[in-house]
């Protein structure tokens, strides 16, 4: 990954059709996005088995759903969501809401082995049902 610098106020983009996820940077197991909501947009309640996330509210206000609770998401709020924690977002307070998401993907030995095998199998030539 190369050095990255950006001004969120200059790169933010909004769409009323769908949520805007703008990739900021992407490393091997670490990446960042700018999530731009318009009023009414929702990220449904969900969880990630192998992903830790940090959310920083940069602009506007919305509702953060975490482990069955609701909390206001306003500028300055920083939320750490460890792997396995249920969370979601609801843009119900401001016309526009901007949240920076920083993600760290945990890669365990067993999962890494499966990923390597899957990648290797994709590269092997196949004749019928057998590998050459």
Where are these regions (language model features)?
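Conserved hydrophobic "DFG−1" position in protein kinase catalytic cores
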Residues: 34-36, 56, 91
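Conserved short histidine dyad/triad with adjacent acidic residue
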Residues: 33-48
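Glycine- and acidic-residue-biased ligand/ion/polar-headgroup-sensing regions
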Residues: 50-52, 57-62
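Short acidic-glycine-tyrosine-enriched beta hairpin
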Residues: 69-83
